[in-house]
């Protein structure tokens, strides 16, 4: 998870970008922070997917094979 300080900095840079523009250094910092944020979001999403089971109205497991394969590859022992 990204620290509150980093999230706050992302928001400050975004606001400044809209209001007055960013310096070259600030643009580089913003890009780095955004990449770190997206990496974190993707990782969290993948962790959530690894625990999902899809059930039909009758209670049968209908989890797509592609998701089952992903879960099998990423099981924690």
From Swiss-Prot:
- Give any Gene Ontology cellular component: cytoplasm
Domain of life of the native organism = Bacteria
Recorded hits in InterPro entries, A to Z, give: DUF896
Region: Disordered, residue numbers = 56-77
Entry keyword set: Cytoplasm
What Gene3D superfamilies has UniProt attached to this entry?
A: Helix hairpin bin
- Composition-biased stretches, type Basic and acidic residues, lie in 57-77
Q: Where found in the cell? A: Cytoplasm
Q: Name one Pfam family in it.
A: DUF896
By what name is this protein known? Answer: UPF0291 protein OB1671
Q: What is the lineage of its organism?
A: Bacteria, Bacillati, Bacillota, Bacilli, Bacillales
